[in-house]
Every structure is written in structure tokens, then in C-alpha cells.
């Protein structure tokens, strides 16, 4: 077992950073050193921002997004199209779609996808609230923005069946060649989907 190179407080910081996705022990150690070197301009303000976030962040009861208010900023936005709902697996997907600037609808976060392997069943997801939201008179379209994985597509089929009794159109994101993507680098599944879902030029 490697020896500690610093006091317990610094080792604790490194251990916590190493729990972050994409950060292993070595990257966590480097990040900790940068924070320590810049403790006045980075570590202190970061610690304060994290303290405030920990105290104020809540989950929106309407859509499942995280924010410092409930309903969240997106649900409060009257400029959003109330007739469309974009269903996503996780908040990170919601944020990614928001960064694209392509969505003017509201969102619904499922909180995961169905997975027999991970033991995630329908009752573990935010599905009851989805049915409630899809049932309002002004709702016209539910857009399933779920992963193109087996579990993602299984979830999409389940949601489609769940909403089949409602007078709403259920659509899904197109799959295919990404903007700027070269065919040589794409996998067979992506190329196959791109051919099947081709559009007029």
C-alpha cells in the first residue's frame, strides 16, 4: 500500500477528488495540487461554491432537473413550448441538449433507464409523473431523447407503450452521422442507422 505523502486533510481531498468520474488517483493528486497552489483564487471560492450548492440545490418536482429553485428555471420559462416534452435519462443529457440550443420544449428526466442487468425496473424510474404530464390537454408530442443502447431503446419502447392510450405523438431522436463526422471512423451500427434514416437533400 502506498504511503501517504501529505497530512490527512490533503489525503482526504485527494480521495474525494478520485471519486469523480474520469479522475483516477494520479489525476486527483494533480487536481489537488492545483487547488492547493491556488487556494486563494480557486480552492477557497470552490469550497464556498460547493457549500452553497450543497445547501441550495433541489430536484425539480415538475421535471426532475436539478436547480436552486423548484420548479426549476426551465420549467418556469414561459417561452418554452408547452405542447412538447423531451424525455431524457439523466440531468446530464438535459444539460447537453440545452447546450445545443436546439430545444424549445420542456423536459422530463427519467432518472435512469430500464436495465435487467442493473436491476432497474419501471417502478424505479420517474414514469408516473411522465404519464401525468403527457396527459394534459395541450400536450402534442413526446420526444424520446434516450441513448441508442439496448437498454435505452428498451426504455423507449416501454415508454411508447405506456403512452399509447394518450392522443400524443411519440418521436425519437434520429441516429446517424454526426456533424463533421467522417464515415471511415463510424461504427457499423451508426452507419446502418444513418442509411435507414436517410432524408431528402
Curated annotation (Swiss-Prot):
Q: Is Zinc-finger set as a keyword in this record?
A: yes
HAMAP family per record: RecR
Q: Which UniProt keywords apply?
A: DNA damage, DNA recombination, DNA repair, Metal-binding, Zinc, Zinc-finger
InterPro entries the UniProt entry points to: DNA_Rcmb_RecR, Rcmb_RecR, Rcmb_RecR_Znf, TOPRIM_dom, TOPRIM_RecR
Give a short account of what the protein does: May play a role in DNA repair. It seems to be involved in an RecBC-independent recombinational process of DNA repair. It may act with RecF and RecO.
* Name of the protein: Recombination protein RecR
The Toprim domain sits at 83-178
Q: Does the keyword DNA-binding apply?
A: no
A Pfam family that the UniProt record links to this protein: RecR_HhH
**Where does each C4-type zinc finger lie?**
60-75
Task: Note the coiled coil stretches, chain numbering.
Answer: none
Q: State a single Gene Ontology molecular function.
A: DNA binding
Family note? Belongs to the RecR family.
Supply one GO BP term: DNA recombination
Amino acid at each position: 500500500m502506498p504511503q501517504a505523502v501529505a497530512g490527512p486533510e490533503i489525503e482526504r481531498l485527494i480521495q474525494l477528488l478520485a471519486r469523480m468520474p474520469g479522475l483516477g488517483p494520479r489525476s486527483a493528486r494533480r487536481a489537488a495540487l492545483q487547488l492547493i497552489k491556488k487556494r486563494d483564487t480557486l480552492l477557497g471560492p470552490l469550497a464556498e461554491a460547493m457549500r452553497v450548492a450543497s445547501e441550495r440545490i433541489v430536484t425539480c418536482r415538475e421535471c426532475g432537473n436539478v436547480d436552486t429553485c423548484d420548479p426549476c428555471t426551465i420549467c418556469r420559462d414561459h417561452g418554452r413550448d408547452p405542447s412538447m416534452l423531451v424525455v431524457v435519462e439523466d440531468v446530464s443529457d438535459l444539460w447537453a441538449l440545452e447546450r445545443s440550443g436546439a430545444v424549445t420544449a420542456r423536459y422530463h428526466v427519467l432518472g435512469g433507464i430500464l436495465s435487467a442487468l442493473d436491476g432497474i425496473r419501471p417502478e424505479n424510474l420517474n414514469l408516473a409523473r411522465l404519464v401525468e404530464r403527457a396527459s394534459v390537454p395541450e400536450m402534442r408530442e413526446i420526444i424520446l431523447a434516450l441513448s441508442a443502447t439496448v437498454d435505452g431503446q428498451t426504455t423507449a419502447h416501454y415508454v411508447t407503450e405506456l403512452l399509447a392510450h394518450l392522443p400524443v405523438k411519440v418521436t425519437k431522436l434520429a441516429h446517424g452521422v454526426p456533424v463533421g463526422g467522417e464515415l471511415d471512423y463510424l461504427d457499423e451500427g451508426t452507419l446502418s442507422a444513418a442509411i435507414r434514416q436517410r432524408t431528402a437533400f
